Regions:
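Non-catalytic accessory segments of hydrolases
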Residues: 1-158, 408-426, 434-441
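Active-site loop->helix "elbow" adjoining a glycine-rich segment at hydrolase catalytic centers
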Residues: 113, 162-166, 194-198
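Active-site loop/turn elements of alpha/beta-hydrolase fold enzymes
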Residues: 142-144, 151, 224, 377, ...
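Alpha/beta-hydrolase active-site loop
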Residues: 158-179
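Substrate-access "cap/lid" subdomains that shape
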Residues: 176, 205, 213, 218, ...
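Alpha/beta-hydrolase fold nucleophile elbow
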Residues: 181-194
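Short glycine-enriched nucleophile-adjacent loop
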Residues: 197-210
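Mobile gating loops/cap/lid regions near enzyme active sites that modulate substrate access
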Residues: 322, 326, 363, 367-452
Length: 452
């Protein structure tokens, strides 16, 4: 392992220490805004002392992930704090402004998944060090507020969409600071997985988010749950709002409740969501709250306008539904959709929650005059019972084998070789899109033999 040292980076509002290991700079937990409970993100004040950003950063308070059975306990041991609005940056050390000036590099900013209830941008499985080293890009992992702290509208207490506002604040930080890491603020590709991909879809329509004045120039949507986004969430949001008011108006006041107490309220709301078809995402961006104070028809129109000017790369895993069969079976029978007799539960979830609507968005991007890219990930260790399940693509893009080696979905004699060999090619593909390269084809099936 290469020796690790500290390096000073000057940002707009002050200086930080980042770590330098080999040819990669990594800054962890760089604050982009201040979080006040149930309030929009606030600007940070300039600072004079050098802030150390070389240690693991905190997560938004959260319960264990629903997908630990696939991914393993990826958040175990991480500190949690409501003061969690930070980014983590990985960049080639040879391109820093303090060294010989070079051409600014494309930026890939990443919004993690986790159903808007778990995850964080500084997790080791989402490290962009290997991606930055392999592709000559600057990678930024974004941490934002989750669950009841980030997305649940509570009348008289909390607006919705605070996590979406956090993401926009992080993108503004990138615009203002990424050149300090050798990144080009005019070449930002916003990538997101699962809930992160759904976030990008919402940012297409957000006030100041998408369109010609966008905070990002290209978009990668990985396994976006757009089928769940299309479900009628209105009644569920109202029911959870009422339940939250009851809980916070009693023995757990919103202003004084501890984070753990708020998570217990969130757990009750998640249980209440089982009466609704959209229970996969009880907490998610909601129309009627900033920056989405628009009608459904205006939302759709804004997405279509964004597709005209933001190049799109969209795709999914072949066996998405494997991860969610138990969740689907937990929907109350009165709210559970009927499954065609020709389809299995896994196939139905894969198509209706993820794949069909992603296919439609790709077609819409083509109709808008674009040349969108598409991928299907169809690779998994031969012995894995999870097949090419939801989140499988992440092991080939971020983190590397050392971070993912304990994930149950990668168990098998060929797991390490697949992650390393196929991952090298997948990283090239993601970087090629971020660079705007012409590969002579735009549709990709990623299997064990995949080469760019």
């Amino acid at each position: 392992m290469a020796d690790c040292s500290k390096i000073r980076i000057q940002l707009r509002d002050g200086a930080i220490y980042a770590s330098k290991q080999g040819d990669i700079i990594r800054a962890r937990g760089v604050r982009y805004a201040k979080a006040t409970r149930f309030q929009p993100p606030q600007p940070i004040e300039p600072w004079t002392d050098i802030v150390d950003c070389t240690s693991p950063a905190s997560l938004c308070p959260q319960m264990p992930s629903r997908l630990e059975a696939l991914n393993g306990p990826i958040t175990a041991g991480h500190a949690m704090s409501e003061d969690c609005l930070h980014v983590s940056v990985c960049a080639p050390a040879t391109n820093l402004p303090e060294t010989t000036p070079k051409t600014l590099l494309p930026v890939i900013a990443f919004l993690h998944g986790g159903g808007y209830t778990s995850g964080g941008g500084d997790l080791d499985v989402y490290s962009g060090a290997d991606l930055a080293a392999a592709g000559g890009v600057v990678h930024v992992g974004i941490t934002y507020r989750l669950g009841i702290l980030g997305y649940q509208p509570i009348q008289g207490t909390a607006p919705g969409n605070l996590g979406l506002l956090d993401q926009m604040a992080a993108l503004r930080w990138i615009r203002d600071n990424i050149s300090s890491f050798g990144g080009d603020a005019q070449q930002v590709t916003l990538a997101g997985a699962s809930a992160g991909a759904d976030s990008i879809y919402c940012l297409f329509a957000a006030d100041g988010g998408g369109g010609e004045s966008s905070l990002f120039q290209r978009a990668i949507l990985q396994s976006a749950p757009l089928g769940v986004r299309r479900m009628d969430r209105g009644a569920m949001v109202e029911a959870l709002d009422s339940a939250a008011q009851d809980a916070l108006g009693g023995c757990c006041p919103a202003e004084t409740a501890t984070p753990d107490e708020l998570l217990q309220v969130q757990k009750k709301l998640a249980l209440a969501s089982r009466s609704f078809e959209a229970l996969l995402m009880p907490f998610a961006p909601t129309l009627g709250h900033a920056p989405l104070c628009i009608s459904e028809s205006e939302f759709t129109a804004r997405v279509q306008r964004a597709l005209k000017c933001i190049p799109l790369f969209i795709g999914y895993c072949r066996d998405e539904g494997v991860a969610f069969e138990a969740i689907f079976n937990g929907i109350h029978p009165d709210a559970r959709p009927a499954i065609p007799t020709t389809a299995s539960v896994v196939d139905f979830i894969s198509r209706s929650w993820f794949q069909d609507d992603s296919d439609r968005l790709w077609e819409q991007a083509r109709a808008a005059g674009g040349d969108p890219w598409f991928y299907e990930l169809a690779v998994a260790p031969a012995e894995s019972p999870f097949k090419a399940a939801h989140t499988m693509e992440m092991a080939f893009i971020l983190g590397g084998w050392d971070a993912w080696k304990d994930a149950p979905m990668l168990k098998g004699a060929d797991g390490e070789a697949l992650v390393k060999n196929v991952g090298a090619e997948v990283k090239k593909l993601w970087v090629a899109f971020a660079r705007g390269e012409d590969l002579s084809r735009t549709r990709f099936r990623i299997d064990e033999h995949f080469q760019i």
